[in-house]
Amino acid sequence: MSDNKTSLSYKDAGVDIDAGNALVDRIKGVVKRTRRPEVMGGIGGFGALCELPTKYKQPLLVSGTDGVGTKLRLALDLNKHDTIGIDLVAMCVNDLIVQGAEPLFFLDYYATGKLDVDVAAEVVTGIGEGCIQAGCALIGGETAEMPGMYEGEDYDVAGFCVGVVEKEDVIDGTKVAAGDALIAVGSSGPHSNGYSLIRKILEVSNADLNEELNGKTIAAHLIEPTKIYIKSALKMIAEHDIHAISHITGGGFWENIPRVLPQGTKAVVDGSSWEWPAIFNWLQEKGNVDTYEMYRTFNCGVGLVVALPKEQAEQAVALLNAEGENAWVIGEIAAAEQGEEQVEIR
């Protein structure tokens, strides 16, 4: 190497290995708190090891991946990063419960232009809290510092979850039949969907995020973390004959409920069976959003829709409410003609 040339380092290129190591040290306690007995070893290896729980006779693995969309931009604008990790876990594990799966382990991907250890630690601490709520282990992840790919300290996150279900107990919608009852399980707010529309509404209405609505600021309503349904849903599944579960995410009622319905059936939803949480009425008014578009974009207060035999509905609602959920009968399954829409909201 020539003496008159500057010696370049990875840090000169914008990647701080020491910061990455500091983050790993900060989150070791978070990972430890999520540990399950099936997990072998700790973080830092090239791969993570996890045994299958011994209680399963014919275990099927169920996997899922998701992000939190442009809710991240809201978190960045508010400089509030401690709950976005809960959102990330929720979006993944709530998809697994649709098939009756118990989440086993979770991995995260955190990418940024310049690693802020404090912000990243807040995000991962939220991921750990989400894993605790879901009963799954945080067994690894990737932190990618990529200068030139992201603006400043902006970041993006993705989650990956694997769960397990007994083969004979998979919930796949094939048992859904006309006459089944539909149960709604309430959401905590918009969860992690529709935020591009939310941000557009905020822009065109020039809304004040510090405005109060039912005792909370608009900002607090919008950043409220996604509800994790795992523990209450698993208990419901254990005690009732669940025919289908739909996680109401992007696409709202119109897109998500048909995903779990067999041909020849439709969900008839009683729109008068619940009142939308105030934040949805506020969004509709501020954005002059059509009701059809609201149901197509947002969960409108419903996080899960569950199909089960009508005679079991009231008991299932009571169980869910005893577990701390807000559940109610929202409608029923009816026969559908060929080509008919599979969701009807009356």
UniProtKB/Swiss-Prot annotation:
One of its GO terms (molecular function) is phosphoribosylformylglycinamidine cyclo-ligase activity. The keyword Acyltransferase does not apply. The lineage of its organism: Bacteria, Pseudomonadati, Pseudomonadota, Gammaproteobacteria, Vibrionales. This is Phosphoribosylformylglycinamidine cyclo-ligase. The gene is purM. SUPFAM superfamilies: PurM C-terminal domain-like, PurM N-terminal domain-like. InterPro entries: PurM-like_C_dom, PurM-like_C_sf, PurM-like_N, PurM-like_N_sf, PurM_cligase. One of its GO terms (biological process) is 'de novo' IMP biosynthetic process. Pathway: Purine metabolism; IMP biosynthesis via de novo pathway; 5-amino-1-(5-phospho-D-ribosyl)imidazole from N(2)-formyl-N(1)-(5-phospho-D-ribosyl)glycinamide: step 2/2. It is found in: Cytoplasm. PANTHER family: TRIFUNCTIONAL PURINE BIOSYNTHETIC PROTEIN ADENOSINE-3, TRIFUNCTIONAL PURINE BIOSYNTHETIC PROTEIN ADENOSINE-3-RELATED. Belongs to the AIR synthase family. The keyword Nucleotide-binding applies. One of its GO terms (cellular component) is cytosol. Its main location: cytoplasm. Keywords: ATP-binding, Cytoplasm, Ligase, Nucleotide-binding, Purine biosynthesis. Its EC number is 6.3.3.1. It catalyses: 2-formamido-N(1)-(5-O-phospho-beta-D-ribosyl)acetamidine + ATP = 5-amino-1-(5-phospho-beta-D-ribosyl)imidazole + ADP + phosphate + H(+).
